[in-house]
Amino acid sequence: MSERHAALTSLPPILPRLIRRFAVVIVLLWLGFTAFVNLAVPQLEVVGKAHSVSMSPSDAASIQAIKRVGQVFGEFDSDNAVTIVLEGDQPLGGDAHRFYSDLMRKLSADTRHVAHIQDFWGDPLTAAGSQSADDRAAYVVVYLVGNNETEAYDSVHAVRHMVDTTPPPHGVKAYVTGPAALNADQAEAGDKSIAKVTAITSMVIAAMLLVIYRSVITAVLVLIMVGIDLGAIRGFIALLADHNIFSLSTFATNLLVLMAIAASTDYAIFMLGRYHESRYAGEDRETAFYTMFHGTAHVILGSGLTIAGAMYCLSFARLPYFETLGAPIAIGMLVAVLAALTLGPAVLTVGSFFKLFDPKRRMNTRRWRRVGTAIVRWPGPVLAATCLVASIGLLALPSYRTTYDLRKFMPASMPSNVGDAAAGRHFSRARLNPEVLLIETDHDMRNPVDMLVLDKVAKNIYHSPGIEQVKAITRPLGTTIKHTSIPFIISMQGVNSSEQMEFMKDRIDDILVQVAAMNTSIETMHRMYALMGEVIDNTVDMDHLTHDMSDITATLRDHLADFEDFFRPIRSYFYWEKHCFDVPLCWSIRSIFDMFDSVDQLSEKLEYLVKDMDILITLLPQMRAQMPPMISAMTTMRDMMLIWHGTLGAFYKQQARNNKDPGAMGRVFDAAQIDDSFYLPQSAFENPDFKRGLKMFLSPDGKAARFVIALEGDPATPEGISRVEPIKREAREAIKGTPLQGAAIYLGGTAATFKDIREGARYDLLIAGVAAISLILIIMMIITRSVVAAVVIVGTVVLSMGASFGLSVLVWQDILGIELYWMVLAMSVILLLAVGSDYNLLLISRLKEEIGAGLNTGIIRAMAGTGGVVTAAGMVFAVTMSLFVFSDLRIIGQIGTTIGLGLLFDTLVVRSFMTPSIAALLGRWFWWPLRVRPRPASQMLRPFAPRRLVRALLLPSGQHPSATGAHE
C-alpha cells in the first residue's frame, strides 16, 4: 500500500467517521424506515395491481384507430376486449344458443364493466361468420370498460365471474380469452412468481455466500443487509406508487425486486472483499474499514448512479412497457446505493466490533496475479482471443428472430391460454385476432355508388398477399353477397324471359284462334255481300211503293180537304161545345174531323220517307261496293297473321333451345365467388336483412365503414406485421379517383398494434440507449477522470451487450428452439448498459490506485486485488438475474438469462481479459488526459515531487540530471 494511500487513511473523511460513530443508530433508522414503509402502505404487489398502467401505447395509430371505430359506431371508447369462446362435444344446438342468450343478457346488463358486445352469433344473418366449420364452436367479442390496466383487469374478472356463474348445458364449455384476458393473466402470473423467485434467489445467494466466505455468520449478515435493503426499496416504491407519483407494471415490480437483491448483494461483496483484503494486509479493523470505504464508496456511488441514470432514461420512452420501468427502478437503485453507503458500513462496523466479519480463509491472489502477468506480457493475443470469444455471440445476432405472441411465454394452465387452445381447435389464430379497417368520409355511403367503391376496397385488400378473409358490408361472411354479380343479374333476366316463354307460346297459339275468327269473318262478309245485293233490290221496290203511297196519300189529303172546307162551319160547333165530351155522337164526329188533320201529317211524313228512301237507294250500292275491299283486307290480315305465327313459332323454338338453362351462368358465378362484377341495386337497401348488415358495418350516419380483416397465419409475428402497410396501401389505391377519395383511413388490430409497438420500441431503444450511453460515459469520465478509460468502459459494455444478446439468441432460439419475445431486446440492452460498467469501474478504480507502481505492475496488482471479489460479485449478480428463469412468465426468464449471460461474459471475459489488455496496449494513453508514469518513481521521490525537480535539489552541484540518464 502506498504512502499516499496511508496518508489518506490516516485522516479519514468525515462521512465514514460519522457512519462508524453512529453505526447502531443508522442500523436502527434503516430498520425503522423499512418497517414504516412496509406498514404504512400495502405490499408492492397489491399497490402494483391498484396502480398499474395500461401496456397499450395510447398514442399509437392502431390504438387510436380502434377507439375511433368505437366512437363513430357508438359502441365503446377503450381498446380492451375479451373473446368468449363456446365449445361443445357435439355441434352447438338450441341449448347452446339459449345458454349464449342468457350470457349475453347478463353481460349487456353489466354496463359498469361491459361497453359493447359484438354479437354476430346471435344474429342468423352473421352467425356463420362466428361459428366454426364443424359447428362445434362459436365466439363473441366483448369490449370492456377501462383504459388502464386496473379497470381493465376488474372488467376481465367481472366477465369471467359471469361466465363461471352461468351454468352451460351438458357438453358445452365457455372460455374467456383475448388480449385483455391475456394481459390480466400475465399480471397475475408475474405477481405470483415474485415470491417464488425471491425465495429461490435467497437460497441460491445464501449458498453462494457460504462458498465465497466459508462463514455462516457472514452469509447470514449479508442476507440480513440485503433483506433490509429489499424491504426498504419495496416499501418506498410502494409508498410512492400509492401516492400516484408513478405507475407500476408487472415487469417493473419483478425487475425491481431482483435488481434490488442483486445490486445490494453486489455492493455488500464489494465492501467485504476490500475489507478482507485490508485485513489480510495487516490493517486493524478500523483502518480496514476506512480503507474499504475509501476504495469502494466511489465505485458503489458511480455504479448506482449509472444504473439509476440508465434506467431513468427509460422514462423518455413512449411505450408503457419501458416507461414504467424508468422511475421505479431508478429510485430503487438510489435507495440501494444509499443503503450500501450507510447501512452496509454501519452493519460492518457493528459486526466487526464482535469480530463477525473477519476473514475465515486466506485470500488466494496467485491465480489472478498470473492472469494479470499474462495480460501485460501478451496484451495483443489476449485481446484477440477475447474478441474471438465475443464473436461467438456477435455472429449469432443476424439469425435473431422475434415473436409478439404472448401466449407462448405464459403457463398453459392460465385461463386465457386454456381458452385460446380451445379456440385454436376450431378457428385460425388470425380469425380471433383480426385487423379492423375504418374508412371515414364526409357523406352518407348507403347508396349503390359507394357500395361499389367499398367492395373494391375489400376486393383489393383480399387479393393482396397474406390475407385470408375480409368481412365488410358487401361481404358480411367473408365472401361477396350471393346474387350480387352482374352476370347473375343478367342470368336472372334470362330466367325471367324463360318464365315468360310459356306465356308467349300461349299467345302465339292465340294467333291461330284469331286466324280462325278472321276466316269466319271473311265468310260472313261474303254472305253479307250477297245479301246486300238482295237488300238493295228490295229497297228499290220499296222506294217505288213509297212513291206510290205518297201520291195516294196526297190525293186522299186533297179530297179530305175539300170535304173539310164544306163542313168547316159545322166542325166549329163540335169544338165550341163545352159538353161535347159528354155527348158520344158529338165526340165521335169531332174525332172524325181530327182524323182529317192526321192525314196531313201522314202525307208530310211520307214525303220525308220518300226522300230517305231515295238517299238509301243511293247509299246501299255504295256500301255494298265497300265490302270487297274489306274482304280483301281481312284476307290479307289473315295471311299476315299466319306468317307472324310461323315467325314467332320459329323464334320461340330458337329461344327455347338457347335458354335451356338460363340460370346456369348465375349459379356458376355464385359458386365461383368471383368478385369482379359486383353490383348492388338500390332495392337492396330496403331489404330487412341488408339493413341489419348496415348496422354492423356502417356507422349510424353512414359516413364510416369498417372492414374486419383476417390475415393468413399468426398476426403476432413479423410476417403478420408486414401485412399492415400493404392493407393501408391497397385501401388508399382503391378509393383513388372515386367519390371516397380523400377519406380518412384507420387500421387497428393485433398486427397493426404490434407494428406500432415495434416502431415505438426502436425509437425508445434508440433514445434510451443513446441517453444511457451518454450518461454512463459522463459518469465514468467524472469518476476515472480519463476520457479514454471512460470510452473503453462504455465501448466494452456495448460490445459485451451485443455479444451477450447474441449468446441469448444462441441459447434460446438456436438451442432451445424458443424465439425471444420482442421486448427482451430493448429491456436487456438497457439493463446491460446499466449494470455492465460496474466491474470495469471497480477494476479501473483499483488500477488507478495502483498506478504509482507502474502501468504493468498496477494492472497485475489490480487484477490480484479485485479478481476474486469482482468474479464473486459478478457471479452472484448473474445467477440472481438468471434465476428469473423460474418465473411463470417466460419473458422475465428470457430477460433475466440474457442479463445473466451478459454479466457472466462481462465478468469472465471483458473485465478479466479485455479491459486490462486494452489498458496494457494503450499504456499511458489509456489515462489521457491524465499524465501518468509508465514506470514507478524511486521510493524517495515518490511522495514529494517530479523526479527532475527532486534530483536537481539532491544531486551535487554541477551534476545535471541529464548526465545520469534519468528521465521522467
From Swiss-Prot:
Transmembrane segments: 22-42, 204-224, 245-265, 297-317, 328-348, 378-398, 763-783, 787-807, 815-835, 866-886, 890-910
Topological type in the membrane: Multi-pass membrane protein
Record protein name field: Probable transport protein MmpL2
Domain of life: Bacteria
Localization annotation: Cell membrane
Pfam families on file: MMPL
InterPro entries named among the record's database cross-references: MMPL_dom (IPR004869), MmpL_fam (IPR004707), Mycobact_MmpL (IPR050545)
Main location: membrane
Similarity remark: Belongs to the resistance-nodulation-cell division (RND) (TC 2.A.6) family. MmpL subfamily.
GO cellular component, one term: plasma membrane
Key words of the record: Cell membrane, Membrane, Transmembrane, Transmembrane helix, Transport
NCBIfam families the UniProt entry points to: actII
